[in-house]
């Protein structure tokens, strides 16, 4: 007797999430595990944070492992994917989450700052996707990280970050064509303001005169950007990522889903 298929479950799948020791990436990893996937938790600096995520996934009844890699280094991306396949015996889902934020008038941007942002947000994601394609089983999923500022929301002094994410939208469109030979779908999520430690460190830039307010006051103000009058949280993003990772999302391909509660 064949097993009953439960929609949106990920039992038997193996997922890898870059930058998943905290924030949105950690929420992705935990939700993938909650739905039955075995998860590779990638981190670059804090093994303690990554191991907490691993423990949480194991506590949900799935399996996970933390693997260090700096996705700005292509050789480390290759090694990360190789280790993931060796550890779990395959790979079905790759979520590219690692990224950095940047603010500044484009007239003041240095070459060093340009390279810092694009090396991770754009170049890093390109090569994560390349290695995902090479390592994924047929019928796999590649899910990249864009931003609502890439196209939908114009924020002053945010050109470098917005541009680094805008490239992801083009990558997704073309990658989805190229990956069809392995029946791999390629999509991205484009979050708006999402309450994480990164949000609190830079929210003053999104609100006129934001320096006059506390982090808590800025969070309360940001809730009114959405007609739903609440903040976005990592779980809001993770739930959509898990949908894109599921069999039920097979016909969603080459798309960028804006996740900002209608703010943009």
Swiss-Prot record:
Enzyme class: oxidoreductase
Induction of expression: Expression correlates with the formation of the sclerotia and thus the pigment production and is directly regulated by the cluster-specific activator CPUR_05433.
PROSITE patterns per the UniProt record, alphabetical: ADH_SHORT
Top-level division of the source organism's lineage: Eukaryota
Residues binding NADP(+), per UniProt: 24, 70, 97, 130, 161, 165, 196
Pathway(s) served: Pigment biosynthesis
Gene3D superfamilies to which the protein is assigned, alphabetical: NAD(P)-binding Rossmann-like Domain (3.40.50.720)
GO molecular function: oxidoreductase activity, acting on CH-OH group of donors
Pfam hit, one: adh_short_C2
Keywords: NADP, Oxidoreductase
Function recorded in the entry: Short chain dehydrogenase; part of the ergochrome gene cluster responsible for the typical purple-black color of the ergot sclerotia. The ergochrome gene cluster produces several ergot pigments including the yellow ergochrome secalonic acid and its derivatives, as well as the red anthraquinones endocrocin and clavorubin. The pathway begins with the synthesis of atrochrysone thioester by the polyketide synthase (PKS) CPUR_05437. The atrochrysone carboxyl ACP thioesterase CPUR_05436 then breaks the thioester bond and releases the atrochrysone carboxylic acid from CPUR_05437.
Similarity field: Belongs to the short-chain dehydrogenases/reductases (SDR) family.
Identification of the protein by name: Short chain dehydrogenase CPUR_05429
The organism of origin for this protein: Claviceps purpurea (strain 20.1) (Ergot fungus)
